[in-house]
Amino acid sequence: VVKLILSVILELVFTVGVWAQDGQGPQIPSVKIKNVGGTVINTADFGTTDKPVIISFWATWCKPCIQELQTYHALYPEWQEKYGVSLVAVSIDDARNASKVAPFIKSRTWTYEVLLDINQEFKRAMNVNNVPHTFVVQNGKVVFSHSAYSSGDEEELEELLKKLTGKK
């Protein structure tokens, strides 16, 4: 069992590294979902330029998700300035909990785009099995994928942003 888990982890690390180097990850799927303001967004429009887009799947009940997004919130202004990055948080809260999302993000003063994937169509299209799950998209391709969160993951993400944008 340990060997199997280790081999899966190594395969994921290798695959992510390859995506980041050659930009040939899978195409971001086209799913229409609403943002917290009610505007319909097509997910295929994310990351269509060389400016990276961070997409983070989360839920209001997920403590590691909130910890990750709070960390991103603190770093986001600097990352926008340095790397031209955009951040999109995709809530997978279902219809019963979706009404909690807007007040939740308002109380935390998150300034990035928040989408409501109430039917979890985008989640399924991106093969997200658990949250938090973070992707980076550039030129229409998924170039990074990471599941779970622990303190320090944002440093790995910033290193990737440096590589993708050629900035230090």
Listing of model-derived features with the role each one plays in the protein:
Residues 32-53:
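A short beta-strand-turn-helix
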Residues 62-66:
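Short, thiol/selenol-centered motifs that function as redox-active sites or metal-ligating centers
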Residues 50, 103-110, 118-160:
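Thiol/disulfide oxidoreductase modules built on the thioredoxin-like
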Residues 67-107, 119-124:
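Structural microenvironment flanking redox-active thiols in thiol-disulfide oxidoreductases
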Residues 18-22:
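Boundary at the C-terminal end of the N-terminal hydrophobic targeting segment
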Residues 3-17:
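Bacterial N-terminal signal peptides
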Residues 54-55, 87, 134:
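Hydrophobic beta-strand anchors of alpha/beta hydrolase catalytic cores
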Residues 50-53, 58-61, 94, 130:
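Short pre-active-site segment immediately N-terminal to redox-active cysteine/selenocysteine motifs
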